[in-house]
Amino acid sequence: MKLRLGVIAAVPPVAVHRISKSQMAHFTYEGQQIAYTEHGTGRKVCVLLPGLLTSQRMHIPLAKSMAEQGSRVITMDPLGHGDSDKPVEMWRYSMRQYAREVVALLDHLDVSAAVVGGASLGANTTLEVAAAAPERVKGMILEMPVLESALLGCAMAFTPLMCAQTFAAPVMRGAGKVASLVPRRFIPLLGEVALDWIEQDPAPGSAVLQGLFFDRVAPPREERREMKAPALIIGHPRDPVHPFSDAGLLSNELENSRLLRANSILELRSRPERLTGEITQFVTECWAPKKRATKPRARRTASRKPAASAA
C-alpha cells in the first residue's frame, strides 16, 4: 500500500472535476437505481464505464475534455459501483448484466447508438455490449481489457480482496469510515479514486467479485472475431492484471481496430493530454458520415454512322 500511495503522490495532479448530486441522474433497471451523468450536448454520443469497484469519477476529466470538443459524454456507475444501488446478491453482477444496463441506459436516454468504452471492467462490459447488441455500438474504447492472459494475475489480485471483504468485513468497514473522513477538496484524481475504492461497503463489493468470478469475464474468442465496430484498444506494460498481451491479442482479433500503447497504467489519469486527444479523435471518426460508394460511370461510346455504299 505504501508503494501505491507513493506512486499516486509522485504523479502530477490532474484538475478534478467533481460531480454534484444535482448534476447526477438515475434511472431504474430491474428495480435498481443506476447513476449516470451527462456532459455536453450534440450527436456524438459516448458512454464511459469505470473500472472494477471504482466509480464514474475516474472518467470525469476525460468526459469534460471530450464535451468541450463537441461530444455528448455519459458517465455511468454500473450496479454495485459509485452512486448506483449496491445489492448484496451475487447473481445480480456479471459482465453480461452490466452490458444490459448500458443498453437500458441508451433506451432511457432515447439514444439509438453510441460509442461505448471504459477501463478494465468497463472495457470488458463494452465487449459484451458489442456481442449482445452490435447495432447499438458505433465504436469501442477498450482501455486495459482483461482476457485470457490475465487469468493468473486476476486470481492473485482479487481472491485475497474477496476473502477480506467476506471474512474481515468489520476491519474493511473501519478502513472505509476512516477514508470517508478524508477531505476531498484538495485530493488529486488518483487519490480520490483510491479513497472511493477503500470507502465502499465490503458486502456488495464481495458480491460483485463473486458474481464476476462465477460468470464469463468477456465474450469468447469466436464472438470477438465477429465484431465489426471500430475499436481503439489502449494497453500498457508491466501490469499482470491488464497485460499488454491481452490488448495485442484483441487487436489481432478485431478486424477494425487500432492498438495504442500507453506509457503506464497512470498516464490517462496523470498526464492525459496525448491519450485524450487520441480518444477524442477516435470518437469523431466513429461519428463521421460514411462516404457512399459511387458507381463508376459508364463510358459513352461514339456512335459511328454506317459507311455509304458505293453506287
Model-identified regions with their sequence ranges:
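Conserved HGGG/HGGXW glycine-rich cap/lid loop of the alpha/beta-hydrolase fold
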Residues: 32-85
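Short beta-strand/loop motif that positions the catalytic acidic residue
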Residues: 227, 233-235
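Hydrophobic, aromatic-rich cap/lid helix
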Residues: 193-222
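Active-site loop/oxyanion-hole signature of alpha/beta-hydrolase fold enzymes
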Residues: 78-117
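Conserved alpha/beta-hydrolase "acid-adjacent" motif
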Residues: 240-246
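Flexible "cap/lid" loop of the alpha/beta hydrolase fold
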Residues: 127, 131-132, 138-167
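Catalytic active-site module of serine/aspartate enzymes centered on a nucleophile-bearing elbow/loop
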Residues: 257-311
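Gly/Ala-rich beta-loop-alpha elbow adjacent to hydrolase catalytic centers
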Residues: 118, 122, 126
